[in-house]
Each structure stands twice: as C-alpha cells, then as structure tokens.
Amino acid sequence: MLLPLSAAAQYDEPCDSITSIVERVMDKKIKATFNVDFCTSLNGYFTEGDFDGASLKLNRLRLDLKGGISEQFSFRVRQSFNKAYDKNSTENVPNSLEYANIQWHPNPGFKLTVGKQFLTIAGYEALANSMYVREFADFNDNLNFYRLGITGAIKLDQERNHELQLQIANNRGGTDADIYSYGLPAGIEPTKLPFIASVCWSGYFDDKAWNLIYAASVAPVAKGKNLYYLSCGNIYEKGPIFAYLDVMYSREEIDTQQRITSLQSGGLVPVTVQNAEYLSFIAKFEYKFNSKWSAYVKGAYETSGIYKENGIFGAGRYMTNWNAQASVEWVPFEKDKGFKLFAHYLYKGYSLEGPAAFLNAYVPDIQRVSLGAIYAIPVL
C-alpha cells in the first residue's frame, strides 16, 4: 500500500513549479499582464543619397510578462527575439533576456528590485519603450542597458513626486574580449570588480507636467581605469504636447563604447583607445492632433573625442555626428490603441575632425525611409 502512495507523492506538482505558477496566473491568483510586442516595417536604404535597396524588417518581437504575486511582491520577465541568444559568461543568461526580476515594496515609499533590470542611467530616450523608438542616438545604441543588479528606490516626499535610486549592477555580461575588439591596451590588467554604481534622482513639477531625471555612475573597467557617466532627462508632457531634452556624457579611461577605436583602418596596427569621451544632446517634440493622429520631429547631436593623449592618439575631437528624424503615426482603431501605423524618415550624418585624419577612416551619411506597424498584443 505504501508504494502507490509514495509514487503518487513523488509526482505531485510543487507549488513553485512553472506549471503551478502558470495555473495561478490563468486562475487570476496572480495579477499579471502578458503582452506580445511586435514592430515591423518596410525600409528603403540610402547611402550618400544613392538608393541601396529595400527590405522588410522585423524590428522588435518580444514577450513581456509582469504582475503582482502579493501586495508586497511583484515581478517582470521580458524576452526579446531580436538579440543574441548566446549565454554570456558573467550573468549566465543571454542578452535577449532583458528583464528577469523580483520587486519588493513593503510600503509606498520604498521599493527594492533584484535581478536583471534596467541600468540606472537618466535620459528619456534610453528609458523609453524601445518599441516606440525608431532610431536611437549612437550613445544609447552602443550601450547594453539591461544588467543583473540590485536597486533601492526611496520616495523623498509624502506626495511621492521625488525619488532617489541607488543601484549596484554588473557593468558587463561577458569578458573583456567580448567588449574590446582589440583587447585591453598593453600593460593594463583586467578589473576584478566589474560593477557599476549609480545614483539617480527623479522629480515631478508643475502638476507633473515636468519630469526631471538626473543620474551619475562610476565603474572600474580595468585595474586603475574607470568609466564615468553623467546623464539627465528633461521631459515635458501636457495636453497634446510631449517633448524632451536629454544630455548624456561619458568619460572612459578605456574606450568602452568603441566608437573611436572602430575608426582605425588599413595601414595601422589597431589597439583599444584610452581616455575617450562622448557627449550627446537628444531632443524630441511630439504633437497629438487628436486621438488617432500624431507627429514628431527628433534630432541628436553627438561628439566623440580624446581628452588626454595616449600612444598615437592625440587629444581633441575626432568625430561629430547627428541625426534628424520625422514621423507621422496613426492609430486606426479607437478600441485598440496598441495597434499603430507609422511613416518615418531618418538622416544620419558623420564628420571626421582633424585629429582623426591619420586613421584613414570613412563614415558615410545614411538615410532611411520606413512604413511600418506596431502592435502591443494583450494576451493576458
């Protein structure tokens, strides 16, 4: 008699199994939303004004599950299908897994987030839902903002208009070889503490029409070499108007973004650049004509330079680049605002400055015209 009972007990579903959790979600014992985010477009590509060709592209496809386990605990898991699935060596998860975290909020004034999450860096473009960003500035396009970490968020006032965040997270998912195309510079040893520490303040003003976000970060990237970020987002939203101005700055004692390092071409023995700095200004103005139609213009102005001579690289500005964008968007169905059609134009220009002449580099101007669709499909 004991054998059948033991066998039955052996196959009982544990209460924390995947199947059990899914059943609780479906039974509404866990309050959750589950979206399939989808963005595709027909794109025409141009280089220096010459037509290169056209193609259909699936820009974004991802699964986004988030919800509450109890009054004090919530979670989020988001999987992208447009990023690498290779498991990185540091975090033991692929870059395609953007969110995988648990949030503890014991009271309205405090929240602790543990797991894979967004780096605490200010700037609206970086923080925005990437489904609705047609083209990122080069500064944001060269950073991986999703890292394993711990973040504490504290509300600073009773109205909860001001918040302070403190975060410790991995600065990278892989090894130095995954980040630096030509390895660390000669004579420099890798860091044993590849973490990034950030502090961020966010505040609302003028009946929440203004949201200001300011952040600072520091990370050791090698022994005796650091990376510094200063960033801010200034967001305005009232009535039919939405606008923002971001300022992003990084001072990199080793060129982590690799934008100057990648300019090296034939005739040189390529090395990883040191003492790089990047500055970006990103602005957008959007106007909603009615519940269905909206339009925006957006632009970015960015500089890349070296603040201190190292090896064959003298100090000075190496590159200036900019982009200009314009878009018209239409929501055809009043009852399904998650579905949107858009037409978008992009121009990206690059100018190499005097100190970069010896690199023999060439970065062409490019243009893109797109017609596309976005759909956030609510599965749950």
Place the predicted regions along the sequence by residue.
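Short aromatic-enriched loop/helix-cap "lid" or pocket-rim segments at secondary-structure transitions
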Residues: 125-128, 178-179, 257
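Outer-membrane beta-barrel pore domains
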Residues: 12, 47-51, 89-90, 209-380
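Glycine-rich loops and low-complexity Gly/Arg-rich segments
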Residues: 61-62, 136-141, 177-178, 190-194, ...
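Outer-membrane beta-barrel architecture
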Residues: 20-22, 62-64, 100-103, 151-153, ...
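Loop-centered beta-sheet repeat module
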Residues: 167, 171-228
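Outer membrane beta-barrel
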Residues: 21-44, 50-174, 202-206
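Cleavable N-terminal export/targeting peptides
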Residues: 1-18, 378-380
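Exposed loop/turn and edge beta-strand positions of beta-sandwich/beta-sheet ligand-binding modules
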Residues: 59, 96, 108, 146, ...
